[in-house]
C-alpha cells in the first residue's frame, strides 16, 4: 500500500531548529520529546495526542518547573512491548525504555493489572461520529446510508486495535446488515488507526469512517488546520458510546515524584477542562 499521510501539525518538534523530516521515511508523529534527557516516560492511548501539549504546559505550571517528558501516543497493544520490557522499533530506530505512567482504556488496563497500580479514570470522550470528506460528496446523512453498496467504509483494525474497533462497531451495528458489511468489506488500518483511517478518507480510498468525536473536532479546529480537512455527522447511537480514559503508575514508580505528580494532575479540574476544550466530555 502506498504511503498515506495528512498535514499533521508538529507539537514538541516545532520548537527545534534543525529537522530531517521526510514523509514516508524520517517522519515520526507518535513519539514525542527526547528519550535521552527525559525525566518522565509516559505511554498512552494515542487518540488523545492533540490535547497533551496543553496538558503538559499546565502540568509544568502546577509543578513549578519545566520537566523533560518523553511520551508515546499509540494504540495500547502497540506500546505494550515497552510495558513488558521489550524494545520497540520505528524503522531503524530502536527504543527500549521503562514507562513510568500508562494511560489507556479500562479493557487494556485490566490486561496489565499485574504490572501497574490501580487505574483511575480521569476523563471520558463524547462517543463516535461519522467522518466524511469535506462537502460530504456522497450525501451521507447517517449510519443507515453506510449500507449503500457504493459507500466505502474505513475503520480501525479488529485484531490490533480491539478497543476502538469494538466501540465503533457498537455504534453502527443497529443498522441491519452493516456489521456484516464492515467485517467483509471495510478498509482496515494496519498499525495506527488515528493516523491511517483519516488519511483513507482524505485520499478518497474510503467515503466514511467512524471516529471519536474529538478527532472530528480536531480536524476542524483552526488552531491546528487553517482549512478544515473533513465534515462529520453526529448520531444518537454514536453519542452513547462514550469511553473512559484511565491512568496508572507502573509498579516500582509509585514513590517517584514526577509520575505521581502527573497522575495527580490528570485528576484535577484544570486538566479535565483542558480535555473538554479539545472536544472530550470531561
Question: In which residue ranges do the predicted regions lie?
Answer:
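A short beta-strand-loop structural module common to alpha/beta enzyme folds
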Residues: 43, 65-81
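Exported/periplasmic ABC-transporter solute-binding proteins
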Residues: 1-66, 93-98, 106-107, 121-126, ...
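Serine endopeptidase catalytic core focused on the charge-relay Asp
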Residues: 130
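Pocket-flanking alpha-helical
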Residues: 77-116, 217-222
Amino acid at each position: 500500500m502506498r504511503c498515506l499521510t495528512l498535514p499533521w501539525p508538529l507539537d514538541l518538534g516545532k520548537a527545534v531548529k534543525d529537522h530531517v523530516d521526510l514523509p514516508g521515511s524520517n517522519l515520526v508523529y507518535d513519539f514525542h520529546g527526547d528519550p535521552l534527557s527525559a525525566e518522565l516516560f509516559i505511554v498512552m492511548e494515542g487518540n488523545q495526542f492533540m490535547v497533551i501539549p496543553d496538558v503538559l504546559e499546565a502540568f509544568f505550571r502546577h509543578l513549578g518547573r519545566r520537566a523533560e517528558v518523553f511520551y508515546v501516543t499509540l494504540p495500547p497493544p502497540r506500546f505494550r512491548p515497552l510495558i513488558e520490557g521489550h524494545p520497540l522499533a520505528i524503522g531503524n530506530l530502536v527504543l527500549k525504555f521503562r514507562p513510568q505512567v500508562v494511560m489507556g482504556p479500562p479493557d487494556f488496563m485490566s490486561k496489565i493489572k499485574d504490572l501497574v497500580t490501580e487505574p483511575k479514570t480521569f476523563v471520558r470522550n463524547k462517543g463516535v461520529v461519522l467522518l466524511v470528506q469535506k462537502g460530504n460528496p456522497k450525501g451521507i446523512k447517517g449510519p443507515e446510508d453506510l449500507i449503500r453498496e457504493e459507500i466505502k467504509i474505513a475503520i480501525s483494525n479488529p485484531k490490533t486495535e480491539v478497543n476502538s474497533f469494538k466501540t465503533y462497531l457498537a455504534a453502527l451495528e443497529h443498522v441491519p446488515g452493516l456489521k456484516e458489511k464492515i467485517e467483509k468489506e471495510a478498509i482496515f488500518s494496519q498499525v495506527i488507526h488515528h493516523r491511517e483511517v483519516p488519511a483513507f478518507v482524505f485520499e478518497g480510498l474510503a467515503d466514511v469512517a467512524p471516529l471519536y468525536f474529538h478527532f472530528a473536532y480536531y480536524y476542524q479546529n483552526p488552531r491546528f488546520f487553517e482549512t478544515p480537512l473533513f465534515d462529520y455527522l453526529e448520531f444518537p447511537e454514536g453519542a452513547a458510546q462514550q469511553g473512559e480514559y484511565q491512568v496508572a503508575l507502573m509498579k516500582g514508580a509509585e514513590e517517584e515524584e514526577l509520575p505521581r505528580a502527573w497522575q495527580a494532575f490528570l485528576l484535577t479540574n484544570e486538566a479535565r477542562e483542558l480535555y473538554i476544550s479539545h472536544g472530550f466530555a470531561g
